[in-house]
Amino acid sequence: MSSGVKVSQECLDKFQELKLGKKIKYIIYSLNDKNTEIVVQNTSTSTSYDDFLAELPPTECRYAIYDFEYEKGDAGKRNKICFFSWSPDDAKIKPKMVFASSKDALRKALVGISTEIQGTDFSEVSYDTVLDKVSRSTF
């Protein structure tokens, strides 16, 4: 089900910057005040996964892109671009519904995502949980 929410051009531009420039480590997306457009809330060059998690509010929904870097045994360092759909249990119902119905618009606009993570609490987006998911999707 589509919500009619649009994706701002800045969302696409920052994603391309993350993909191609490798300077941005993560992007946090939110809805504008009128719930009509997905916008960039913040970008960061911090390589700390804890900094990224601190950007996910415990009572508000967000989308995020994270350039996840990890070691793959003898294969060395790997990177996976992960899409996060953050809809915490303590968020209000209406925003959760709008976020759920708007996710596909953003997800389809961002070409090059390798892994999707859905989180309702911090255990579902912990480093180890995400590492397990991205390393299983690697051949």
Swiss-Prot record:
Q: Name one GO cellular component term.
A: nuclear matrix
Molecular function, one GO term: actin filament binding
Q: Can you tell which superkingdom this protein's organism belongs to?
A: Eukaryota
Chief localization: cytoplasm
- Which keywords belong to this entry? Actin-binding, Cell cycle, Cell division, Cytoplasm, Cytoskeleton, Nucleus
InterPro entries, per the entry: ADF-H, ADF-H/Gelsolin-like_dom_sf, ADF/Cofilin
One GO term under biological process is: actin filament depolymerization
Localization per record: Cytoplasm; Cytoplasm, Cytoskeleton; Nucleus matrix
Q: Which Gene3D superfamilies match?
A: Severin
Q: Residue limits of the ADF-H domain? A: 4-135
Q: According to its UniProt record, which protein family does this protein belong to?
A: Belongs to the actin-binding proteins ADF family.
Q: What does this protein do?
A: Controls reversibly actin polymerization and depolymerization in a pH-sensitive manner. It has the ability to bind G- and F-actin in a 1:1 ratio of cofilin to actin. Binding to F-actin is regulated by tropomyosin. It is the major component of intranuclear and cytoplasmic actin rods. Required for accumulation of actin at the cell division site via depolymerizing actin at the cell ends. In association with myosin II has a role in the assembly of the contractile ring via severing actin filaments. Involved in the maintenance of the contractile ring once formed.
Listed name of the protein: Cofilin
Q: Which source organism does the UniProt entry give?
A: Mycosarcoma maydis (Corn smut fungus)
Q: Which gene encodes it?
A: COF1
